[in-house]
Amino acid sequence: MFEDEPHAEGAAAVAAAREALQALCQELNLDEGSAAEALDDFTAIRGNYSLEGEVIHWLACSLYVACRKSIIPTVGKGVMEGNCVSLTRILRSAKLSLIQFFSKMKKWMDMSNLPQEFRERIERLERNFEVSTVIFKKFEPIFLDIFQNPYEELPKLPRSRKQRRIPCSVKDLFNFCWTLFVYTKGNFRMIGDDLVNSYHLLLCCLDLIFANAIMCPNRRDLLNPSFKGLPSDFHAVNFKAAEEPPCIIAVLCDLHDGLLVEAKGIKEHYFKPYISKLFDKKILKGECLLDLSSFTDNSKAVNKEYEEYVLTVGDFDERIFLGADAEEEIGTPRKFAADTQFGKLTSQASVDCNLQQHFEKKRSFAPSTPLTGRRYLQEKEAVTTPVASATQSVSRLQSIVAGLKSAPSEQLLTIFESCMRNPMGNIVKIVKGIGETFCQHYTQSTDKQPGSHIDFAVNRLKLAEILYYKILETIMVQETRRLHGMDMSVLLEQDIFHRSLLACCLEIVLFAYSSPRTFPWIIDVLGLQPFYFYKVIEVVIRSEEGLSRDMVKHLNSIEEQILESLAWTNNSALWEALRASANKVPSCEEVIFPNNFEIGNGGSVQGHLPMMPMSPIIHPRVKEVRTDSGSLRKDMQPLSPISVHERYSSPAAGSAKRRLFGDDPPKETLMEKIMAEGTQLKIAPSSVTAESLSISPGQALLTMATTTVTGTTGRKVTVPLHGIANDAGEITLVPISMNTTQDSTAESLVSLTAQSLIGASPKQTHLTKTQDAPLTGISKPKRTGSLALFYRKVYHLASVRLRDLCLKLDVSNELRRKIWTCFEFTLVHCPDLMKDRHLDQLLLCAFYIMAKVTKEERTFQEIMKSYRNQPQANSHVYRSVLLKSIPGEVVAYNGDYEMTDGDIEDATKTPNCSSEPVKEERGDLIKFYNAIYVGRVKSFALKYDLSNQDHIMDAPPLSPFPHIKQQPGSPRRISQQHSIYVSPHKNASGLTPRSALLYKFNGSPSKKAKKRVIAISGDAESPAKRLCQENDDVLLKRLQDVVSERANH
């Protein structure tokens, strides 16, 4: 990708770029300073990158950046940013569509290493474009519903200036209504990129134009006679409009997915006062906006005001939707059916497809389905527009809290009063403090986004408070039943629990309204640590069944964001929790439930499959049963085996929790002592057998699986063992039987470290205390508590993503387990590698290095291609990785394990054209891998190099790989409209022994009975059905196809 071109060719290219830039600047009337800066940046970038596509498009990106940095003094001794050149003009001159601009601009920002403030500006601009595109798609059909089709009327005849004015056409009305909307929306910047509020503002504009059309006696021809909002006597010959302008807000909300209360609030408190202000400023005039004498002046005045707004405040001229070349310039939807010729359909379909792909890639209005947490998803709703989806989310939220108040219910008050110390006062104080902080930041303008009106803030806060008390009551009822009436004071007195729960409710409300204040805005303004906030997410999802499918996906994606990066920042509370636990990072085996690992060395066939799509919805009764530990079936893994109490327990899972709840003995168990101190294990002589054992009261019996020991002769010995542990912490392993290829005499006792037998390999020995085995078949992990829960979720998230990558790249189970072992090694022994970095960065590096070591190589380009298809993938993850300070000496790494630029198609170099000094050194993933990662992991990874005999003996056992979490609930409801449930197939036991013959009286003729007897008694298999050949690869491929097909729907 980074090719050195001849000097002459490079000079010619720069000259051509300079000529193209000069022509562009002349057309835009730009100053020389901005042009020179744009050319310098372009030349620096081109020296480091191969820029694909037209040069003029990249010049437009460079020119836009230069213009945004330009400051122009104004008459009022202020300053104005932007050279008075709108983005629309730049793109129109460069013949670059908006969708292409956003795509290229993202790459340009990465290559130029532009500051975060500029990136956020582009993100706001892109979201504003997306909101406007979605609103315009709704505007056209609503306009057609109310008014005549503007493309069915005859074109205007040319006329001289002396001719008198003619009435406005439907097309003029269409353009005026949209321009008035975008100009009004620009005035209310707090509404601009809020989809729900913007849509209701559009309904207000349509309502205003309709009222003027009704009130003007000669303009009723503009209206659609079949519109349902017309007055009942509209078609009467002597129809006379009422004195008060009619309001059709209710009709529009009913017909076009609006929220009546929200829309009327926008009209009364924002739109009507603003229109009055426009009349006072003489921008609008006349008794009727559509009067013959005033419409033209009104249209010109609104367009002039909006042009000034675009040049001074805005970037994106939203009138571009109305242009004749809108489809080419931006990718807007088709105008109207009557205007669309047959020849345009193909190109229009392509434009709509590009627009749809852009929205799907951005995921602004419909969050993608994360790889984890799918068991909580409900069934898919019918396909709706983004506006309908947003308004339905708000309606659903309002239906959840309907009839409730922002205060504790009688039942919740009873729970508070039953506590040893009534927490009511403290809870009210916390809620009030969070409410004040939220309103202050929600209404405050910042560089990132404008402030909203206090009415919006109060409305959002009230919804969140009602939801908070509702969910808190549900949690308390579940916990009381789960813990059999235990006192709730400890949980209810934890401020972090209430702050996290209310913050989560606020996030739900903001997401329902499609607010631009996206996560982690809410925890930033409330000062919440992500490491604490994530604990409440699953609790909320399980406690509130009314959440929509998109809402659950959004909350799941937030949890993934925290687990993958936000909890690993330099100032995260995670590092304090690790210090409190003596910096002992738990391994996967210590935190995952023992029965949640794959079985066998290579893993089961099931273990090679990706996360299976779960049935959409869990039956409420099944979910209710699962939350009650007392009602769990013996063979059922609980949905969340950790209670809310345990989630908010002290990071040290011993003292506090045990004193408060008494569910663990206060004394350190023998097994904990053994694991902590690395007890020496001894194999007793073969003369000692399990049958001759006698166990004293101070000893414990340990049940063992088989272990494989390599003797001095190199022979492998399979030894089934029993173990006895005494008070001194020593374990004596007693062989039950020994199978070898030849007879061998018992030698002196073989010393093995505990790590070798309680390590990570599924072949290894597992030590469990017999008396500690739970009767329900659900055994607890070795480490519990707050920190263990966090790492359990981290390991699960990483395993799901790795499984998905391995499936797409056709990686063997053996290599997958080695990658997993390497990844776990970095988390446990090199936790600092995760500081201010991303989980996927370490996962991708582990994948690459182990593929190199084992000679099952995958190029980084192949790995990245598969990674980009994951729902959470973001180019920032692999293009901007934190780099530590590197010593002056260059470490001579083995070239075989170094990543080269040829391995990745879009590797990035950091050019020296950064607009601001870089606060921290960052680079692409290749640079991080070669400069930092290899040096820390190479010695460990080389132990799995099978081509080197010295390494085979040193290779640690492979870590166990978590298996797919199966849906524990059964039966599962698959539809909310129909009572249809899915249950696992049960092997029905026959009513009679298999040796007997089944004869059905009055149903089995004698001839068929004879044939049945012959078929059963014969040795040959019945040819009634075609035999299925046992081919695991074919079966696996079919299952993979089914899974992929389900995942794409």
Swiss-Prot record:
Purpose: Key regulator of entry into cell division. Directly involved in heterochromatin formation by maintaining overall chromatin structure and, in particular, that of constitutive heterochromatin by stabilizing histone methylation. Recruits and targets histone methyltransferases KMT5B and KMT5C, leading to epigenetic transcriptional repression. Controls histone H4 'Lys-20' trimethylation. Probably acts as a transcription repressor by recruiting chromatin-modifying enzymes to promoters. Potent inhibitor of E2F-mediated trans-activation. May act as a tumor suppressor.
Matching InterPro entries: Cyclin-like_dom, Cyclin-like_sf, RB_A, RB_B, RB_C, RB_fam, RB_N
Subunit structure: Component of the DREAM complex (also named LINC complex) at least composed of E2F4, E2F5, LIN9, LIN37, LIN52, LIN54, MYBL1, MYBL2, RBL1, RBL2, RBBP4, TFDP1 and TFDP2. The complex exists in quiescent cells where it represses cell cycle-dependent genes. It dissociates in S phase when LIN9, LIN37, LIN52 and LIN54 form a subcomplex that binds to MYBL2. Interacts with AATF. Interacts with KDM5A. Interacts with KMT5B and KMT5C. Interacts with USP4. Interacts with RBBP9.
Residue segments, region Pocket: 385-944
GO biological process terms on file: cell differentiation; chromatin organization; negative regulation of cellular senescence; negative regulation of G1/S transition of mitotic cell cycle; negative regulation of gene expression; negative regulation of transcription by RNA polymerase II
Keywords from the named record: Cell cycle, Chromatin regulator, Nucleus, Phosphoprotein, Repressor, Transcription, Transcription regulation, Tumor suppressor
Residue positions where Phosphothreonine is found in the record: T332, T369, T385, T992
Domain of life: Eukaryota
Region (Spacer): 585-779
Protein name per the record: Retinoblastoma-like protein 1
Entry-annotated residues carrying Phosphoserine: S640, S650, S748, S761, S959, S970, S983, S1004, S1022
Lineage: Eukaryota, Metazoa, Chordata, Craniata, Vertebrata
Transferase is among the record's keywords: no
GO molecular function: promoter-specific chromatin binding; RNA polymerase II transcription regulatory region sequence-specific DNA binding
Location in or out of the cell: Nucleus
Segments of this protein annotated with the region Domain A: 385-584
The family this protein is said to belong to: Belongs to the retinoblastoma protein (RB) family.
One GO cellular component term noted in the UniProt record for this chain: transcription regulator complex
Post-translational modification as stated in the protein's UniProt record: Cell-cycle arrest properties are inactivated by phosphorylation on Thr-332, Ser-640, Ser-959 and Ser-970 by CDK4.
Domain B, as annotated region: 780-944
Gene of this entry: Rbl1
